[in-house]
């Protein structure tokens, strides 16, 4: 008989019991998000979902994303209750820009050592995001990988599938000179630019936990969950049929994201003085001495979603969005691009 001790998975740093305890805690979260098309609950090898009734030529739309280094800030602040909302938002906002209704969502949670309480907070946030977007949390993977992550540090990825009627796909092909650009406000930096944000905090030496802006703790402003625009935008599409293009303003800001939905020869002319930039962006710019152009190339600067409609549809679109609880702005229009011109022109940039 060997004198070597009998090794278990737990000795190697993987706690199967903790994983099972987490699954039990999050079953109710998944149940709250259930859509009628979803067949069965958590625990199967694969999640089954029917195409919703009423579609003539349904097209499935998929997307995947993470939350970037906002996660590092969440870990540093030990704030895990809303990062799951960010994860869902980053995926579903990308789907809705082509007119798709999100159907189901899966998450991937990888960690060095599973903290069941932390993971349950994260997944509860994912469930809240799914409820806000009307999509079903159908499964996920929790991977405990000792030696791959430091301690209880974790990483997140989300995967979402939606559906859109083939004849109603929004792809920007009908965008024309003279069209108007509307915008929906962001809640803050959302889930992009956090490597710059963290560098600004580091270089400035700011104690972000003691600073207040406009009466709100700076940590709350930096960690505010990414807004989920799905329900108001689906209502806008359904009630008006006027949406020609939409751009989710993520990494790359207005400068890199609007061109993704513009046809060749079109230029977006955006007046940056047409909306009130939240104080958190001014604080970041000042503390990091960040160039104004760089601000708009990295951060959303207060705009989370841009919508293109014909000029004669502006008032109707604004009305529908306001009725849905949004506070939209008209921020610019589409022009014919001059030879060699950038696809986005920002007017009234602050001198810095």
From Swiss-Prot:
UniProt pathway: Purine metabolism; IMP biosynthesis via de novo pathway; 5-amino-1-(5-phospho-D-ribosyl)imidazole from N(2)-formyl-N(1)-(5-phospho-D-ribosyl)glycinamide: step 2/2
Compartments in which it is found: Cytoplasm
Cited CDD domains: PurM
Catalytic activity: 2-formamido-N(1)-(5-O-phospho-beta-D-ribosyl)acetamidine + ATP = 5-amino-1-(5-phospho-beta-D-ribosyl)imidazole + ADP + phosphate + H(+)
InterPro entries hit by this protein: PurM-like_C_dom (IPR010918), PurM-like_C_sf (IPR036676), PurM-like_N (IPR016188), PurM-like_N_sf (IPR036921), PurM_cligase (IPR004733)
Top EC class for this record: ligase
One biological process term in Gene Ontology: adenine biosynthetic process
Domain of life of the organism encoding this protein: Bacteria
Membership in a protein family: Belongs to the AIR synthase family.
Name of the molecule in the record: Phosphoribosylformylglycinamidine cyclo-ligase
Species this chain originates from: Pseudomonas fluorescens (strain ATCC BAA-477 / NRRL B-23932 / Pf-5)
């Amino acid at each position: 008989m060997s004198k070597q001790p009998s090794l278990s998975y737990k000795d190697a740093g993987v706690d199967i019991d903790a994983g099972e305890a987490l699954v039990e805690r999050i079953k109710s979260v998944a149940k709250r998000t259930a859509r009628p098309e979803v067949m069965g609950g958590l625990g199967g090898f694969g999640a089954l979902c029917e195409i919703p009734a009423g579609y003539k030529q349904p097209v499935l739309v998929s997307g995947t994303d993470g939350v970037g280094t906002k996660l590092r800030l969440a870990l540093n602040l030990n704030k895990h209750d809303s990062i799951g909302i960010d994860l869902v938002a980053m995926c579903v906002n990308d789907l809705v820009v082509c007119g798709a209704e999100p159907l189901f969502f899966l998450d991937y949670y990888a960690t060095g050592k599973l903290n069941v309480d932390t993971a349950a907070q994260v997944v509860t946030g994912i469930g809240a995001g799914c409820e806000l977007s009307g999509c079903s949390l159908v499964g996920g993977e929790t991977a405990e990988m000792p030696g791959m992550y430091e301690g209880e540090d974790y990483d997140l990825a989300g995967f979402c599938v939606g559906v859109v009627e083939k004849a109603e796909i929004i792809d920007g092909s009908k965008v024309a000179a003279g069209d108007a650009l509307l915008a929906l406000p962001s809640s803050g930096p959302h889930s992009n630019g956090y490597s710059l944000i963290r560098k600004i905090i580091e270089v400035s030496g700011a104690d972000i936990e003691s600073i207040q802006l406009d009466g709100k703790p700076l940590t709350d402003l930096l960690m505010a969950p990414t807004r989920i625009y799905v329900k108001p935008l689906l209502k806008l599409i359904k009630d008006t049929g006027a949406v020609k293009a939409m751009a989710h303003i993520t990494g790359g800001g207005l400068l890199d994201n609007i061109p993704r939905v513009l046809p060749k020869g079109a230029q977006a002319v955006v007046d940056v003085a047409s909306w009130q930039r939240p104080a958190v962006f001014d604080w970041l710019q000042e503390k990091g001495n960040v160039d104004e152009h760089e601000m708009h190339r990295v951060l959303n600067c207060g705009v989370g979603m841009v919508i293109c409609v014909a000029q004669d549809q502006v008032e109707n679109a604004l009305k529908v969005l306001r009725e849905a609880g949004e506070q939209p702005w008209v921020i610019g229009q589409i022009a014919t691009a001059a030879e060699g011109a950038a696809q986005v022109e920002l007017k009234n940039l602050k001198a810095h």
